Regions:
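Extracellular jelly-roll beta-sandwich "head" domains, especially the C-terminal globular C1q domain
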Residues: 2-173
Length: 173
C-alpha cells in the first residue's frame, strides 16, 4: 500500500493505540569466564555473572532471571553449587533468590556442556535498584582437575504485575 491508496493513515495507527502503562525492561549482563583449578577447597566461592537492574519505573515488579554458561571440564571431579543472590539499596548482605543449582561430576571427565536455568523474583520493592549476582560454591571434597565456566551470562526481563499498570516515576517518556 502506498500513500495514494485508500485508507492511508500517515500516523500508522498510533493515534488509535493506547499508551502502555506497564514498562518492560530487558537487560543482559556481560559474558565472563572463570576457572576453578584443581585442589580448590570446599566453601570457595566464585562470582560467575552479575547485572544491576533499576526497577524504579516499575510498580510491583516481576523479574525473570536467565543464566547460561558453557562449562569445560578437564579431568574434573567435584561438586559446585550455583545460586543467584540479590543486593538492593540499603541492604548490607546479599539475599538468595530461588533454589541452588548443582553441577556434580563423580568420575573424571573431559567434556564441554551447557548449564543454564531461569528463576523468577517477585519479591522486589517498588522503586529499587538491585544487583543480581550468580555465585558458584565448591562443596564436598576438594576438586580434581579443572572446570572452566565460559561465557557465563545473566539476563533479566522485568515488568509489572497485573495489579499495577502505571509508571510512578516523575518524568515524561
Amino acid at each position: 500500500m502506498n500513500s495514494m491508496s485508500r485508507g492511508y493513515n500517515g500516523s500508522c495507527g498510533k493515534d488509535n493505540r493506547k499508551e502502555e502503562k506497564c514498562p518492560t525492561i530487558i537487560k543482559c549482563g556481560c559474558p565472563s569466564s572463570n576457572t576453578i583449578p584443581a585442589g580448590t577447597t570446599a566453601t570457595t566461592t566464585f562470582t560467575l555473572a552479575s547485572l544491576t537492574l533499576d526497577t524504579s519505573c516499575i510498580c510491583d515488579p516481576s523479574i525473570k532471571l536467565e543464566f547460561a554458561s558453557n562449562p569445560i571440564l578437564t579431568d574434573f571431579v567435584g561438586t559446585v553449587n550455583i545460586q543467584v543472590f540479590k543486593q538492593c539499596r540499603h541492604q548490607f548482605t546479599p539475599v538468595p533468590v530461588g533454589p541452588v543449582w548443582t553441577l556434580s561430576i563423580a568420575t573424571a571427565v573431559t567434556d564441554a556442556r551447557t548449564f543454564s536455568f531461569f528463576i523468577c523474583d517477585s519479591d522486589s520493592c517498588d522503586h529499587d535498584c538491585c544487583t543480581y549476582t550468580v555465585v558458584a560454591t565448591v562443596v564436598g571434597t576438594d576438586t580434581v582437575g579443572t572446570l572452566a565456566i565460559n561465557n557465563a551470562t545473566l539476563g533479566a526481563i522485568a515488568t509489572c504485575r497485573e495489579s499495577c499498570k502505571e509508571c510512578k516515576k516523575g518524568y515524561d517518556r
